[in-house]
């Protein structure tokens, strides 16, 4: 199976400031990767590079066989921050519909396929009843569901998610995990940045990041006390998909960035 996302000796950052060095990885259609690390470890920066929002500082990154920007129509990206949408008088359904028109111009007319994609995405994330509610009037968790629905409505080949379960309650988290499984079944490659070890454990592979690639492999192989110490700078162990502090270590410095 050919790779959909490829990174070779990839260095990412902002301007001349490196945040993450030496990433070598790949992801095929229908596969999933969790990016795990502390704040500033490079998770968000790597996702933005895969999305084509940042140019790599070194190495090679390819999405669907070319530069990420060239594949932007086939990439769905959920950011941590959505200030622009909150500043506008948009309803939840308007936000989800944006996924179908951002590459087609503001005066494009909705097709049956567009409306079907929007309706299915909102149903999947259990936001249909919120369709006509102003985004700014929704709770943080409800807003997050809407943003995930927006990404699903795009029906891209690659789904990039930055802290997708942040603010979600148990029902929202369950809806999200079901949605990801459904996307993978139809061949979508999924990469998520997360602090949720339970979420990470549902992925095929975990990349542990700390300004560099600490480990890349299946969750049961990668999430060891030794690797977690190298990643977070504190003794941790995995207990029932939670990280538990086992001992305190000296402070482990990271460069600023996400």
Description of each model-found segment:
Residues 36-38:
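The feature captures the beta-strand-to-loop junction immediately N-terminal to the Walker
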Residues 51:
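Helix-to-loop junction immediately C-terminal to a conserved catalytic motif
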Residues 56-73:
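Conserved ABC transporter NBD signature motif
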Residues 97, 112-130:
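Conserved ABC ATPase "signature" region
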Residues 159-163:
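Catalytic Walker B motif of ABC-type/P-loop ATPase nucleotide-binding domains
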Residues 203-219:
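H-loop (His-switch) and adjacent beta-strand-loop-beta switch element
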Residues 224-258:
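ABC ATPase nucleotide-binding domains
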């Amino acid at each position: 199976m050919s790779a959909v996302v490829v990174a070779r000796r990839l260095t990412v950052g902002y301007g001349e400031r490196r945040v993450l060095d030496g990433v070598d990885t790949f992801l095929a259609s229908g596969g999933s990767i969790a990016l795990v690390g502390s704040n500033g470890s490079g998770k968000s920066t790597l996702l933005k590079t895969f999305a084509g929002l940042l140019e790599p500082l070194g190495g090679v990154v390819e999405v669907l066989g070319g530069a990420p920007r060239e594949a932007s129509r086939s990439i769905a990206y959920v950011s941590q921050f959505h200030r622009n949408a909150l500043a506008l008088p948009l309803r939840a359904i308007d936000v989800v519909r944006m996924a179908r028109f951002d590459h087609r111009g503001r005066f494009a007319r909705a097709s049956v396929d567009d409306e079907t994609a929007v309706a299915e995405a909102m149903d999947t994330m259990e936001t249909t009843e919120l369709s006509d509610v102003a985004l700014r009037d929704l709770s943080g968790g409800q807003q997050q569901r809407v943003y995930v629905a927006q990404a699903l409505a795009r029906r891209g080949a690659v789904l990039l998610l930055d802290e997708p379960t942040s603010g979600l309650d148990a029902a929202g988290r369950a809806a999200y995990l079901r949605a990801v499984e459904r996307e993978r079944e139809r061949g979508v490659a999924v990469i998520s940045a997360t602090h949720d070890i339970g979420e990470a454990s549902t992925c095929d592979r975990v990349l542990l990041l700390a300004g560099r690639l600490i480990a890349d492999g299946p969750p049961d192989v990668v999430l060891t006390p030794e690797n977690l110490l190298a990643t977070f700078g504190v003794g941790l162990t995995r207990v029932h998909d939670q990280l538990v502090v086992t001992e305190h270590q000296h402070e482990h410095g990271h460069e600023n960035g996400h």
